[in-house]
């Protein structure tokens, strides 16, 4: 019951999920302000997180769309660096584009943040979208999930509950159907 799996099933799409609790785009949960060596972009090329010499073969799977939900862990605790956050989004966009030249890339803001912290990751994502479009890449987007209010319960350590995952999937399904023209 994760929103990526529910979304893929509903859209009859293949999916690959790269996820780990606490991982960030530049700084893992409660990590140093200067970032972590094992944040997702730095280990994205691995088949297994803890094994450096077994690399993922990006040529074997070219998705139509790549959804990126990172940033919550980076800004969930103080201190974090907004400039490093922005640079990490930009650099990860370039990595994704180099691996998946034809895919649409959608940066997601998840359900856990509100206020300034949410605004900081949205600003960073918007900067990537703006820069990409200025350079002619019109296949980069931002989509915001609605905020988790608690009325659907919580999973472990404030992660989304099963019901929140279903809500997130419903939002993403509708968005991707429109974006990808999948009806």
Language-model segments: which ranges?
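A beta-strand-loop signature enriched in Asp, Gly, Thr, and Trp
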Residues: 75-96, 100-107
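Solvent-exposed, polar/charged alpha-helical surfaces in well-ordered, non-transmembrane soluble domains
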Residues: 5, 9, 87-94, 98, ...
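Loop/turn elements at helix/coil->beta-strand transitions in domains of secreted/extracellular proteins
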Residues: 11-16, 62-65, 100-105, 136-141
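Surface-exposed acidic, glycine-flexible loop patches that form ligand/cofactor-binding
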Residues: 53-62, 94-100, 179-183
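Extracellular serine-dependent O-acyl
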Residues: 104-109, 117-155, 164-183
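Conserved SGNH/GDSL esterase-like catalytic core that processes O-acyl groups on lipids
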Residues: 1-87, 113-123, 159
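Short, surface-exposed, polar/charged, turn-prone segments marking secondary-structure boundaries
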Residues: 2, 44-46, 94-96, 133-137, ...
């Amino acid at each position: 019951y994760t929103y990526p799996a529910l979304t893929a099933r509903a859209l009859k799409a293949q999916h690959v999920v790269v996820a780990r609790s606490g991982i960030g785009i530049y700084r893992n949960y409660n990590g140093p302000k200067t970032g972590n060596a094992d944040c997702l972009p730095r280990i994205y090329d691995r088949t297994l997180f803890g094994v450096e010499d077994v690399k993922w073969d990006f040529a074997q799977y070219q998705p139509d769309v790549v959804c990126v939900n990172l940033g919550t862990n980076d800004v969930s605790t103080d201190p974090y660096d907004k400039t490093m956050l922005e640079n990490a989004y930009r650099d990860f966009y370039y990595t994704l584009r180099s691996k998946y030249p034809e895919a649409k890339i959608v940066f997601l803001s998840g359900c856990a943040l509100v206020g300034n912290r949410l605004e900081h990751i949205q600003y960073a994502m918007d900067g990537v979208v703006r820069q990409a479009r200025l350079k002619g890449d019109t296949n980069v987007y931002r989509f915001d999930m609605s905020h988790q209010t608690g009325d659907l319960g919580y999973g472990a350590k404030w992660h989304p509950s099963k019901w929140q995952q279903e809500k997130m999937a419903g939002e993403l399904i509708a968005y991707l159907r429109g974006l990808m023209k999948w009806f």
